[in-house]
Amino acid sequence: DSVQKIKELGIIDEMKKYIAEGRIKHLGFSIHAPKEVLLDALELYDFDFVQIQLNYLDMIHEPGYEGYEILTERNIPVVIMEPVKGGMLANVPAPLNAPFTNYNPNYSNASYCFRFLMQFPNIKIILSGMSSLEQVKDNLNTFDKEEVFTKEMADAIEEVKNNILKIKKV
C-alpha cells in the first residue's frame, strides 16, 4: 500500500532533511482514500496540513467528513479540494437550484458551496479552480463577507443536494 511504500522509500526522512534545510516550511499531503489509510499516514509524521475532498454532495467521499473529524481531533489544519465538484455544483441548473434562488438570489451556486464549507472551523484553505474574472470576483465577494451559516441556508443546500441526487448518480 502507499503508506508502506512511503516508509520503504524513506520519504519522510528525506522531507525532514528538507525541512531542516529550510526548503520545506509546511509538510502535508493530499488524500483520496479510506479513513484507515488516512490514519496510517498520520502515524508517519506530525503533518502541518492534510488536503481532502469535501463538498455538500460528497460528505462521504473518502475520507470525507469522517476524515475532517479525524484531522480536527488531531488539530491538523484541513485544506479542501473539489469544493464545487469539478464545476458541477457551480452549474446546477434551474429548477434544481430553486432553493438557492429562494434563499438569496444574489448568491451564485458556487458561493453556496463555499459558504457550506466555511461553517467548519478547521478548514483553513478552500481551493477553487477559477477560469474567468467573473468567478474570481464572485469568490472574493463570497470570502470577503463573514456570514453565519444559518439553518435556512443549510436547508436550502440540503434541498438542492436532494434535487441533484434524485436525477443524477453521484
Predicted features by range, described:
Residues 1, 49-53, 80-81:
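Short beta-strands and strand-loop turn motifs
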Residues 3-14, 33-46, 64:
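Distinct, well-ordered alpha-helical segments
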Residues 5, 28-33, 51-58:
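Catalytic beta/alpha-barrel core
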Residues 16, 48-60, 105:
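Acidic, His- and aromatic-enriched active-site or binding-groove loops in soluble protein domains
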Residues 17, 44-46, 65-170:
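Structured C-terminal cap/extension of enzyme domains
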Residues 18-28, 77:
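Short beta-strand/loop segments at the ligand-binding rim of alpha/beta enzyme cores
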